Amino acid sequence: MTVRVGINGFGRIGRNFYRALLAQQEHGIADVQVVAINDITDNSTLAYLLKFDSILGRLPHDVSLEEEDTIVVGSEKIKALAVREGPAALPWHAFGVDVVVESTGLFTNAAKAKGHLEAGAKKVIVSAPATDPDITIVFGVNDDKYDGSQNIISNASCTTNCLAPLAKVLHDQFGIVKGLMTTVHAYTQDQNLQDGPHSDLRRARAAALNVVPTSTGAAKAIGLVMPELKGKLDGYALRVPIPTGSVTDLTADLSKCVSVNEINAVFQDAAEGRLKGILKYVDAPIVSSDIVTDPHSSIFDSGLTKVIASQAKVVSWYDNEWGYSNRLVDLVGLVGKSL
């Protein structure tokens, strides 16, 4: 059965999700069709931003507008809505939408996201950490916990999708007692281009000119997908002046002494086995631009593994836009199978 999808919010993640879907469809992977999008931006601008992208380049499909309310991509027609009144006012029922990808960043609370269900959708996937969802899913870590009964599902954050596979492999093999993480993260739209007012005073400073320390909920969110690690991890983010391509550094106290070779071996086994497609193992001296458009959630850098007795430092890269968007496509596919 083809899963019919509506996208609420056609910004960076909404457009990256659609591009990732097209990429997977070219390989015959995703049986998913986007039938409608909702965004208050005018449709000509949405079509332009889909066609041209400063990171991903030009979309290899013709993009045009038809009758001002339909975006045509190749031979696919997508109804473009501009409903401002919230999820419950959207005409999902009229378009036969099965799954909504909620990517506005505004309706991350389950009580608000529930409006999509009231509007006729069967399931809602929030493309961010959510408040009180039925379940938070990180592929490769707890996707087996989805049983079809959950209606509001969070795809967690891009950083949690990178960190969780890292923590899982380390914990399953060696036992994490406690740990601290830092994500060196590309700037995002919740920062200022130039110095200006912001609720987070560090993020008030110019994103392209500064390394900006700020908070991340990724470490604490690990407890949502790995309850055995609840309260054992914490950390923060350093936003840096690049548009995408981030890296997570996890330092953990383990339950036993280990060696660099032992750690690298278990990560290589996981990347080639149960976490294939989610976790990638690299031994080359890569930098951030090398992982842009890599669809993996977590790209383990074996050359950066460090150990002192029972304390270990492990590092994984991630394209915070493209990797995350590919997991959104995967999650839509997983949820669609339960319909």
From Swiss-Prot:
| GO biological process, alphabetically ordered | glucose metabolic process; glycolytic process
Which molecular-function annotations from GO does this UniProt entry contain? glyceraldehyde-3-phosphate dehydrogenase (NAD+) (phosphorylating) activity; NAD binding; NADP binding
The EC number on file is: 1.2.1.12
Q: In which pathway does it act?
A: Carbohydrate degradation; glycolysis; pyruvate from D-glyceraldehyde 3-phosphate: step 1/5
A single cellular component GO annotation: cytoplasm
The top EC class, named as a word, is: oxidoreductase
Kindly indicate whether the keyword S-adenosyl-L-methionine belongs to this entry: no
Entry-linked InterPro entries: GlycerAld/Erythrose_P_DH (IPR020831), GlycerAld_3-P_DH_AS (IPR020830), GlycerAld_3-P_DH_cat (IPR020829), GlycerAld_3-P_DH_NAD(P)-bd (IPR020828), Glyceraldehyde-3-P_DH_1 (IPR006424), NAD(P)-bd_dom_sf (IPR036291)
Spell out the residues of the site Activates thiol group during catalysis: 185
Reactions the enzyme catalyzes: D-glyceraldehyde 3-phosphate + phosphate + NAD(+) = (2R)-3-phospho-glyceroyl phosphate + NADH + H(+)
- Cellular localization per UniProt: Cytoplasm
Q: List UniProt keywords, sorted A-Z.
A: Cytoplasm, Glycolysis, NAD, Nucleotide-binding, Oxidoreductase
Q: Which Pfam families did the record assign?
A: Gp_dh_C, Gp_dh_N
Record-listed NAD(+) binding positions: 12-13, 39, 84, 127, 320
Q: Which residues take part in binding D-glyceraldehyde 3-phosphate?
A: 157-159, 188, 203, 216-217, 239
Cysteine pairs bridged by disulfides in the record = none
Q: Where is the active site?
A: 158
Task: Summarize subunit and interaction data from the UniProt record for this chain.
Answer: Homotetramer.
Query: What job does the chain carry out?
Result: Catalyzes the oxidative phosphorylation of glyceraldehyde 3-phosphate (G3P) to 1,3-bisphosphoglycerate (BPG) using the cofactor NAD. The first reaction step involves the formation of a hemiacetal intermediate between G3P and a cysteine residue, and this hemiacetal intermediate is then oxidized to a thioester, with concomitant reduction of NAD to NADH. The reduced NADH is then exchanged with the second NAD, and the thioester is attacked by a nucleophilic inorganic phosphate to produce BPG.
User: Member of which family?
Assistant: Belongs to the glyceraldehyde-3-phosphate dehydrogenase family.
What name goes with this protein? Glyceraldehyde-3-phosphate dehydrogenase
Q: Which gene encodes it?
A: gapA
